[in-house]
Amino acid sequence: MDALRLANTGLAVDIFKKLCEKSATDNFVFSPICISTSLALLHRGSQGNTASELQKVLHFEKVKDSDFGFQLLSSDISKVISIYSLKLLKRVYVDNSIECKKDFINSTKKPYPLELETIDIKSRPEEARCQINSSVKELTDGNFEAVLNEGSCDEKTKIIMLGAASFKGNWVYKFNESETKEMDFHINKKETKPVQMMHLEARLSIGYINELKTMVLELPFTSKHLSILILLPKDIEDDSTGLKKLEQDMTFEKYAQWTNPSMMANSKVKVYLPKFKLESSFDLKDMLKSLGINDAFNEEASDFSGMTESKDTSISQAIHKACIEVNEDGTEAPDVTMERRLMNKEEFCADRPFIFILRHNKTRTIIMFGRYCGPCEASSTAD
């Protein structure tokens, strides 16, 4: 399980860094676990160089049984989904002209029970597109509509890899709505924009990355199965968001070190955090290619012979959507009277760009990963 956690973290950090390279100032959010689960299913059905490329990008070199690992991981995460407004949709749609091997189908039933779906795309591509969109809308309680654009499916579409994730949770300690005030958010050294800034005083886990002058704060959600981790540089020291050094230095080993509970202390913290809602949409095809998955998207080079005898089987589309909302809602109020009497409170004021991670605490799996650089349009799109 530890090997799989590290592997999934590796892919999460790789994707995060690619998105940061694409734009230094965009807000974004994505769900690494949705992407890694779908890729792991496709890896299960691949052979030859296609399998080698997928294995490398998934960081599976030291993972002995990825299928069993995902089975355990999915079971752990599914147990807490009902507690939160958390939706995780991971689908690999395969055109039914591709006859999947029975052995392959049987091998996916436990580790990927809902992820594989056959659908008639070839003979009715537009109907199939609408059917997929309708299914995604229903399974995410209406959070996502028109995931696949008109004309995106045709008779040549073979495999669609699709992920959608949304989250809105209740904190263990709610932020007092009456204390939410408009404050300046520093986009960079020179520019500010107004945000609705929430306020909380409570005992929380907080750490510090000395070499990067960055604070790490854990804000737990109700029942403490999930937490948001916020990485906040103490000052904006570059010519952009202040996150450049943190983004460049991040590796999956360093991420694991920075967010390790043993590196954090329980302290009295005065928190200022902006309310925000982010929605991002990505075509992952070019990004996954840049990470090293090439053959799987090339019908002349792809080898999915572990899945099917059908030739020219390749991934036609890889679409991902994610949405997260952060507000004051919580289950209990901290003992504010006591906390305000106590001295030596640390201040964590997120009035400048920060990185955030939604983490499943038992497995330390990254459910969502994102960057907030200030108030802007409701959604972002990346190719």
From Swiss-Prot:
GO CC annotation terms, alphabetical: extracellular space
Q: Does the keyword Secreted apply?
A: yes
Could you list this entry's UniProt keywords, alphabetically sorted.
Answer: Glycoprotein, Secreted
- InterPro entries in the cross-refs: Serpin_B9/Maspin (IPR000240), Serpin_CS (IPR023795), Serpin_dom (IPR023796), Serpin_fam (IPR000215), Serpin_sf (IPR036186), Serpin_sf_1 (IPR042178), Serpin_sf_2 (IPR042185), SERPINB5_serpin_dom (IPR033836)
Q: The organism sits in which domain of life?
A: Eukaryota
Looking up Pfam families in the UniProt record yields: Serpin
Q: What is its main location?
A: secreted
Q: Which SUPFAM superfamilies match?
A: Serpins
Q: Which family does it belong to?
A: Belongs to the serpin family. Ov-serpin subfamily.
Biological role: May not exhibit serine protease inhibitory activity.
For this entry, the protein name equals Serpin B5
> What is the gene called?
serpinb5
